[in-house]
């Protein structure tokens, strides 16, 4: 959610194009995954613009096929001389066709970090979040959705992790059609 100088929170994003390149660039001043030489990854960038705010958003999707990993980041570029305020940016929206997953997270405290908590998805919203301005052992910005029959060696698991996080919110919502939405 972006707020313009007049207080408006309305954005009209239009598709402008895409870029496809080998490798993955490092994020400036943030820890990140990367592939400087273009041998392990391929990146798709989708470019969206708002002509009224003079805002460009670059949605970067990188696959590391050897590791079965998709990495995503978003760039917000203010092309105007006006102040824009970024109020909220969700990292992902993923819709799954059913909700037959277990929600697995790791919470804890100093000297007993990463205690495993596993619960079945249920109707409504399940979430983990933190307003501490940093990752911590209390609420780790990682979770996974696993089929109940999954073992260490086989089965279906989706893992979600912020590589760099301040405040964060991870939510899974199960609707009345028994589908799951991850945000």
Positions of PLM-derived features:
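Polysaccharide-binding surfaces and accessory modules of carbohydrate-active proteins
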Residues: 1-182
């Amino acid at each position: 959610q972006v707020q313009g100088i007049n207080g408006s929170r309305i954005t009209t994003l239009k598709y402008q194009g895409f870029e496809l390149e080998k490798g993955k660039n490092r994020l400036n001043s943030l820890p990140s995954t990367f592939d400087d030489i273009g041998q392990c990854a391929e990146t798709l960038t989708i470019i969206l613009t708002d002509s009224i705010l003079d805002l460009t958003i670059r949605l970067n999707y990188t696959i590391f096929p050897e590791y079965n990993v998709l990495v995503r980041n978003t760039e917000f570029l203010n092309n105007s001389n006006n102040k824009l305020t970024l109020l909220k940016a969700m990292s992902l929206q993923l819709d799954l066709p059913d909700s037959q997953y277990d929600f697995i997270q790791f919470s804890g405290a100093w000297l007993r970090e990463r205690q495993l908590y596993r619960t079945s998805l249920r109707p409504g919203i399940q979430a983990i979040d933190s307003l501490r301005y940093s990752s911590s052992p209390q609420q780790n910005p990682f979770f996974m959705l696993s089929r109940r029959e999954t073992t260490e060696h086989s089965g279906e698991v989706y893992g979600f992790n912020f590589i760099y996080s301040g405040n964060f919110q991870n939510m899974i919502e199960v609707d009345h059609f028994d589908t799951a939405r991850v945000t």
